[in-house]
Amino acid sequence: MVVPRGQEHRAPQEVETREDEEQNIKLTEILELLVAAGYFRARIKGLSPFDKVVGGMTWCITTCNFDIDIDLLFQENSTIGQKIALTEKIVSVLPKMKCPHRLEPHQIQGLDFIHIFPVVQWLVKRAIETREEMGDYIRSYSISQFQKTHRLPEDDEFMQRKEKAIKTVTDIFEVYKPQRKYKRQKGAEEILDEESKVHATLLEYGRRYGFSRQAGKTEQTEDKKIVLPSGLAAAGKAEPCDEDDLRAAEELRIKTLMTGMAAMATEEGKLTASTVGQIVGLQSDEIKQIVSEYAEKQSELSAEERPERLGAAQQHRRKVASLNKQILQKTKLLEELQAKFVDLQAKCTEAKKTLTEVESYSEKLDKELAALETIESQADSSVLQNLRMLVAINENLKSQEQEFKAHCREEMERLQQDIENLKAEAAENGEEEEPNKLIDQQYQTEKEKLQKIRLLLARRNREIAILQRKIDEVPSRAELTQYQKRFIELYSQVSATHKETKQFFTLYNTLDDKKVYLEKEVNLLNSIHDNFHQAMASSGSREQFLRQMEQIVEGIKQNRMKMEKKKQENKMRRDQLNDEYLELLEKQRLYFKTVKEFKEECRKNEMLLSKLKASSS
């Protein structure tokens, strides 16, 4: 492979990257995100931005429990091909993680931090969430493992109290379990609908539904303190409440269900054990209060059994129901009126707002009119007179233009009507053949002209297309810049391949030389071994053999001295080239620094020019 002169020992040029302020800001934000997430290698100043960003993305992916096929050991100064292969592996894992942002390998390799930032932000968020989930899982697993082998004092205390608590709860359930108070008679009417069956079953256990709150409280007091006989329970009613006819019908239905029931034999006419215990445990004042309440209830029940009292109560309930209906109607009417009031109030507010806008616009017009009058009073009267005259002339010309257009339109309609009449007359008289021939000839002539013009237009369009293609073949500045970047990348790849191939050739030549020397050594040893016994047979042959050995040793020493000398020369040349390389690197750094300072000065110059233009304008 042929390498251009002057570039054989030159380091591969790096790919140009966007180094504007926005890219630098995004790079700083990416590094701050990675450090905040726990990737502290991003603080190392010796690493390149590519190594920091790619390392951070790889760390986030592995933290999220996703596998990525990369080398375990860190490799510095990777080639373009190695970087692209690494970025392709990273990008291939992102769809598996269901990343909502798209990213291409060349964007990572080209350090396009604007497009890399959303992906890194999402990866850091996902890594933190995964770490929290793993922390919760490890914490719960640790607690479970601890609980398998150890116990806290609270756990021991709970285990000691557990059996006693279970026994207490069981006893409470046994004491307060539902007790059947009534039983349906055998000859009672059969209940058909399911809801009535449910109510009847609940009534058998003393559960009454459909009463008011006051009635429910009275029943609870009766259940807790005393159990009345079945006749009193069937006749018991709540105090009059403000309910409608449906509630009265519900009470009537419950009473009907109660008529088909009889009290249980074990509880008829006596108190339950729990009620007796409660009464005994109460004080004397409470016992007196219970007796008075029982007397009041008994008097109310006896009063309600009278038919004349029953009619008055029913009439009172109906009046209350009708009044409730009237209250509901008035309430609905009030709500409708309130809604209309709110609507009218909104319209009034909107009208006031419109009025305010109109008044402000009127004031603005008045101010402008006053300003115009002021200007008119200050202006020259002759100029104003000329302006008024010109405005009048303009208006007059506009009106004349409208009249002329209307007159032309009428004239055109009249002429078209005349043409139609003439055509009709000519068709009747048969005198239009000669004009038709002239018209056809003129039409054919114009048609041929049109065809020629179209041919010329097509030829001109072809010429324009050819010129356009030639213009398009010349690359623009952006395309040339892109080509230059791609050529630099290709050159870097070719240079790396050339360097690698050169190393292989050097290694091959070294091994080949080593092989030649080893073969010579083996042949020499074999020759010595074969001729040793024959040379030792006589003194003359022995001396000759020793002289030959000395000559061979001398030749080997000379070859060794030559190789050492060549090695020293190569080493000196390497040191010299290394010094030159370091000088070139220093020049390159100085060049990049100068370019950066020049860009900064250009930016400052542009800002000053823009400020100068703004101040001058």
From Swiss-Prot:
Compositionally biased spans, kind Basic and acidic residues: 1-16
Encoding gene (name): CCDC93
Region (Disordered): 1-20
Gene Ontology BP terms: Golgi to plasma membrane transport; protein transport
GO cellular component entries: early endosome
Name this polypeptide is given: Coiled-coil domain-containing protein 93
Record function comment: May be involved in copper-dependent ATP7A trafficking between the trans-Golgi network and vesicles in the cell periphery.
Family indicated by similarity: Belongs to the CCDC93 family.
Subcellular location(s) of the protein: Early endosome
Sections of the chain in a coiled coil: 285-474, 546-614
Keywords noted in UniProt: Coiled coil, Endosome, Protein transport, Transport
Keyword Coiled coil (UniProt): yes
InterPro entries: CCDC93 (IPR039116), CCDC93_CC (IPR019159), CCDC93_N (IPR048747)
Domain of life: Eukaryota
Species of provenance: Gallus gallus (Chicken)
Main location: other
